[in-house]
Amino acid sequence: HFDQDHYYGLIRVLNDPSFEFGKIYHNGLPRYGFNTGKDLNLGTLSSSSGGGPRSITTELRDLASAQTLLASGLLLTENHNDNNFALFLRAALKASNEGRLGAMRMLVKRNPGGTAKILSDTGPDCSIEVLAPVTTSPTGPIRLRAFHDPHKVTATAPFPSPTESHTINGNSIVLRLRHGNKEFLFGGDLNQPAQKYLAEKYAPANPFSAEVNKACHHGSSDFELEYLKAVHPCATVFSSGDAGSYDHPLPDAMGAAAKHSSGEFPLVLSTELARETDSKGKIKLMGHINARSNGSTIVMAQKKEKPSESKTWYTFELPYAGPFGGH
């Protein structure tokens, strides 16, 4: 989805002629510019009559629609310059025109009760299933649920006004990678109302179980316990920067992840302290998290901050049986 921490760094990569790409997948929600009249800066909301949940249009599809959006003048800043999303689209079009990008595609799930949606460019030994975003209807115009801040919910207002951040994050692309008989879940920036919505859409099925769970939204407190219980992983990975005002991952997210994991020794791995800069500006990378699978066994590894001669990584085979292997 088009939050800056998920796409802005790719602009430089897309503009680099030494890189080639197959497809760019996205959730269909563009980031409009200043004073365009677009709801939530994302699209057009459905009517709010009745106080129920609302939906929003999807207005980005392929590279042709990207070109149309750029020509519309709706992706400009207050100073009439391209906003960051426009810069991303221009970089994608440049890569396409140079033969370095194959396609841009919107990725959604239309019928949660239907057959699994598997990305076409994955194979039988390693497949990627698309679980979200789930459209509000299996047919007709492609609209997504507009999500609210759960802190604003009251007994008389179960669906308060949706917000830009909860809607863009809540409609993250969610993927489950299956390698052999092992599964990895990637939940993007899903939040609590989105996780509840997905549970309702898929009920009574549970497509979210996985041995390894990439924690949603870098370890935010905005999560639904029932979602964590449905995933029930052996290991959870939190990916977040060391700086910033959000202090992710938060203690409740890490604690809940451990409590609702499987096994006596659930693993919670975090990239929070991932690098160090000395007085000369030299960056030393550490705390890297690595997952390896042969289809029947998964090994998680975390790089030591100060590797010894005999050991660079801490390694854990899943399900982890503890430091003494049950002996």
Summary of predicted features, one role per range:
Residues 1-14, 213-226:
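Di-metal (Zn2+ and/or Mg2+/Mn2+) metal-binding site signature of metallo-dependent hydrolases
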Residues 7-187, 191, 259-267, 271-327:
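Flexible, acidic/histidine-containing loops and adjacent segments that form or flank the divalent-metal
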Residues 9-13, 197-201, 223-231, 252-256:
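A short acidic, amphipathic alpha-helical/loop segment
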Residues 7, 246-248:
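Conserved alpha/beta-hydrolase "acid-adjacent" motif
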Residues 3-5, 30, 191, 216-220, ...:
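Catalytic metal-binding/acid-base residues of hydrolase active sites
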Residues 21, 232-238:
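Proline-aspartate-enriched helix->loop->beta-strand connector
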Residues 198-203, 207, 219:
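Nucleic-acid-processing active sites and adjacent nucleic-acid-binding tracks
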